[in-house]
From Swiss-Prot:
Name of protein: EF-hand calcium-binding domain-containing protein 3
Keyword Metal-binding found: yes
Any single Pfam family the record assigns to this protein: EF-hand_8
Residue segments, region Disordered: 394-432
EF-hand domain: residues covered: 45-80, 81-116
InterPro entries: EF-hand-dom_pair (IPR011992), EF_Hand_1_Ca_BS (IPR018247), EF_hand_dom (IPR002048)
Keywords: Calcium, Metal-binding, Phosphoprotein, Repeat
Keyword Metal-binding on entry: yes
Length: 432
């Protein structure tokens, strides 16, 4: 009886049909609230990066950004805004309502998720323009700083990584945001009107799935780029200069053996190895003197006789003649090099090169003079520093009067001013 009485008094309420739009609304509010709690705080490095970006603005005496400082910063970056737009931006960014933007207001605006989504993914019916879309000016100025590299590299990396992470965290919230309705039907053919939107598009592409990326590339291929766009032109330069245009030929025989023999050759001087010089002077010593009255060498005269004897030439004859021509050309170049070498030695004697280094207390004059004796006939210097020192040593042995340790009287004859100075110094020392 008790149980039946209990059943009679217990009445269940009828079930109600679920209202889907209310459930979606509640879920949407829960989802946005969950993301707000997920918001992370700024690290010390990120806070320092924002501080350095804040210091780039023109500020007043109190260290805050007023309307004049904001307009001056905008003008420096090449952005056009009138006083009314500046007032709206200042009013939107002034959180404590003191008429200025301090660092706390600056951080609150740039870390605000709604303003960030408004700057990155604007609403479809709102044109992405600074004049008609207040609240995104600080994002645009910050992106300009990154674009022109006004900040240090460390600060740029911190800011970009912060906003990239913020965009990835807000990617799911864009589904419920009124500014996210345009995200899935973006006009990729028209360039973005904002640098912040361009950075956001790059970040969006970096987190795309493979299927979405293929769709994006297919849509990008269907776009007709402008004819004056540099991206529509085919580059004429190699993209990989070390790889493109390199034709691998057939390797020579015994190349490794020759390389090992070359490395085993003894080196008398480091400069010979460094400049890869040839011993052209020994070759020039073997050159026969000119015996003909015409002034030409025997090799050139022999080639002239060959041309007179034969009127019809074959390929094999031309190959054989090539060696004679090369020998005659080398002989001619060596003869010119020897003549220039004599001229340079005469110039060294005239300027008394052995005394220039002593007078200036600079022994590198040998190397300097040797550099200016470069000859394209032998592709190296005609006189090395070693040759000049050997020449001075031979001259000093044969004629003591021309040595570097010559007497003050000899120096006074060759250079009167230098001799007078030395005589004055010696007389002063004698008086002391």
């Amino acid at each position: 009886m008790a149980i039946s009485g209990f059943k009679g008094t217990l009445k269940l309420k009828p079930l109600k049909t679920p209202v889907f739009y209310k459930r979606d609304k509640d879920f949407r509010g829960y989802f946005s609230g969950h993301l707000q709690h997920k918001e992370t705080k700024l690290s010390p490095a990120q806070l320092e990066a924002f501080r350095n970006a804040y210091n780039f603005f023109t500020k007043d005496r109190t260290g805050c950004i007023d309307s004049h400082g904001l307009m001056s910063t905008v003008a420096k970056l090449g952005m056009n805004l009138n006083a009314y737009d500046i007032y709206n931006e200042l009013k939107c960014a002034d959180r404590d309502r003191d008429g200025k933007i301090n660092f706390s207001d600056f951080i609150d605006v740039l870390t605000d998720k709604k303003l960030f989504l408004k700057a990155v993914v604007p609403e479809k019916r709102i044109c992405l323009d600074l004049a008609n879309n207040p609240g995104i000016l600080l994002f645009e100025i910050l992106s300009k700083f990154v674009e022109i590299s006004a900040l240090h590299r460390k600060d740029i990396i911190e800011l970009v990584s912060y906003f990239r992470k913020k965009f990835q965290e807000s990617n799911s919230e864009i589904l419920w945001s009124p500014y996210g309705r345009r995200a899935f039907k973006t006009d990729i053919c028209s360039p973005p009107r904002s640098s912040t939107a361009a950075f956001a598009n790059s970040a969006r592409i970096s987190i795309m799935k493979e299927r979405d990326l293929y769709k994006f590339l297919e849509a990008l291929k269907r776009c007709n780029l402008r004819t004056d766009s540099p991206y529509s032109k085919i580059p004429v330069f190699p993209l990989f200069p070390d790889v493109d245009g390199v034709v691998l030929g057939k390797p020579f025989k015994d190349t490794q053996k020759l390389e090992m023999l070359r490395k085993r050759e003894p080196l008398s001087f480091f400069e010979d190895y460094f400049f890869n010089k040839r011993d052209w002077k020994t070759q020039a010593m073997n050159v026969k003197p000119l015996k003909s009255a015409s002034g030409y060498s025997d090799d050139i005269l022999a080639i002239d006789q060959l041309f007179k004897k034969k009127q019809h030439w074959t390929v094999s004859d031309a190959v054989a003649l090539k060696q004679h021509v090369k020998r005659a050309t080398d002989t001619y170049h060596l003869g010119i090099a020897l003549d220039h070498r004599k001229e340079m030695l005469n110039l060294w004697k005239k300027i008394r090169g052995d005394l220039v280094g002593l007078e200036s207390n600079n022994e590198s004059f040998y190397n300097t003079f040797s550099t200016y004796t470069w000859s394209w006939n032998v592709c190296q210097e005609l006189l090395s520093a070693k040759d000049l020192r050997l020449h001075d040593a031979n001259v000093n042995k044969t004629s003591p009067s021309n040595s570097g340790l010559s007497s003050p009287s000899d120096l006074s004859e060759s250079d009167p001013e230098t001799g007078r100075k030395r005589k004055r110094k010696s007389s002063r020392g004698f008086r002391q």
